[in-house]
């Protein structure tokens, strides 16, 4: 996750464009050729001036295999995805999902209308900045247009691909929250650590 304040973005549009271009290019590099560059990324990240952790530990999640416990290594090419599946695109529906989890677990103590989730997501996620950077990366010859979801309205299609199998539609967050078996529901509030 990479975020900037609205003030910084407004005052530094060229820097924001350059940063976003760099993040897109790095994400493409990490995922291209079946993750072929991940071993080099692991070595870079292991350096003391960056993460400074043991390269073998970083490699566990970065190189397409994961060791769940001693001796239990499994192929997991999508354990970390940086660019595939439009992973870098700032979908409003992703922001709305985070907000639904905050509401579900009481970090947002009171009901919010579906429109509040949409407005909040749109106040933070800026696909127009991302699209401008993607177009610049394409113009620079470092990507192809078909690699990007330029037609996106900011919302992914409804999906039931989460671990619980519950269908999530970012355009109907309250229906999603109410469909979950545990967590706060419509009409419930949190006050003084108690659910009312």
What feature does the model see in each segment?
Residues 1-66:
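Pocket-lining segment of extracytoplasmic ligand-binding domains
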Residues 49-196:
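Segments of small-molecule ligand-sensing domains
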């Amino acid at each position: 996750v990479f975020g900037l304040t609205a003030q910084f973005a407004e005052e530094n549009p060229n820097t924001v464009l350059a940063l976003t271009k760099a993040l897109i290019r790095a994400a493409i590099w990490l995922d291209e050729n079946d993750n072929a560059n991940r071993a080099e990324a692991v070595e870079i990240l292991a350096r003391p001036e960056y993460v400074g952790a043991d390269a073998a530990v970083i490699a566990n999640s970065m190189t397409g295999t994961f060791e769940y416990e001693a001796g239990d290594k499994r192929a997991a090419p999508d354990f970390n995805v940086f660019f595939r599946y439009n992973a870098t695109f700032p979908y409003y529906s992703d922001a709305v999902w985070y907000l639904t989890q905050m509401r579900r677990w009481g970090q947002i103590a009171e009901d919010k209308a579906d429109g509040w989730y949409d407005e909040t997501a749109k106040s933070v996620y800026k696909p127009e900045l991302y699209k401008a950077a993607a177009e610049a990366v394409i113009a620079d010859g470092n990507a192809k247009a078909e690699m990007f979801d330029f037609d996106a309205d900011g919302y992914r299609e409804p999906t039931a691909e989460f671990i619980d199998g519950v269908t999530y539609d970012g355009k109907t967050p309250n229906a999603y929250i109410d469909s979950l078996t545990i967590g706060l529901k419509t009409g419930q509030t949190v006050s003084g650590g108690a659910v009312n």
